């Protein structure tokens, strides 16, 4: 399975990158391919472009604030292939987030 994700927290420091690490670790454990864009204190890193979103089976937005380019995910949202969660939930229990995401497929 191919997943794209964006992480962003209110301050853009710790939780943004902790959520990224949790998503990548859980994805690897399950044998999934994931690309995680971070929108934090360093700006946008590892940007997910429209082609990446279109090619993905599903998208996860682990965000606590508005993000740049959220319209990239409109089609995933409309087709029910988008999971939006709080970054702290990803950090606390990434397994549960992936279980929830798998139900969208």
Where are these regions (language model features)?
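Ser/Thr/Gly-rich flexible loops in soluble cytosolic domains mediating phosphotransfer, phosphorylation
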Residues: 4, 78-105
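Short, structured active-site "lid" loops
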Residues: 50-69, 73
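A short, flexible N-terminal coil/short beta segment enriched in small residues
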Residues: 1-24
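N-terminal beta-loop-helix "entrance" segment that forms/cooperates
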Residues: 29-56
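Cofactor-binding loop segments of dinucleotide-utilizing enzymes, especially the Rossmann-like FAD-
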Residues: 8, 39, 87
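Short, solvent-exposed amphipathic alpha-helical segments in soluble enzyme
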Residues: 19-24, 76-78, 99-100
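Metallocofactor- and cofactor-centric catalytic cores in central/energy metabolism, strongly enriched
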Residues: 40, 45-46, 62-68, 84
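Short glycine-/acidic-enriched loop or helix-start segments at secondary-structure transitions
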Residues: 15, 70-72, 94
């Amino acid at each position: 399975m191919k997943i794209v994700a964006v992480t962003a927290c209110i301050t853009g420091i710790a939780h943004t990158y902790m959520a990224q690490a949790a998503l990548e670790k859980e994805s690897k454990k399950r044998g999934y391919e994931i690309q995680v864009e971070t929108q934090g204190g360093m700006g946008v890193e590892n940007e997910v472009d429209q082609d990446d979103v279109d090619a993905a089976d599903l998208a996860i937005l682990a965000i606590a604030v508005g993000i740049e380019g959220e319209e990239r995910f409109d089609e995933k949202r409309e087709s029910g292939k988008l999971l939006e969660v709080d970054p702290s939930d990803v950090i606390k229990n990434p397994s549960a987030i992936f279980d929830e995401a798998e139900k969208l497929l």
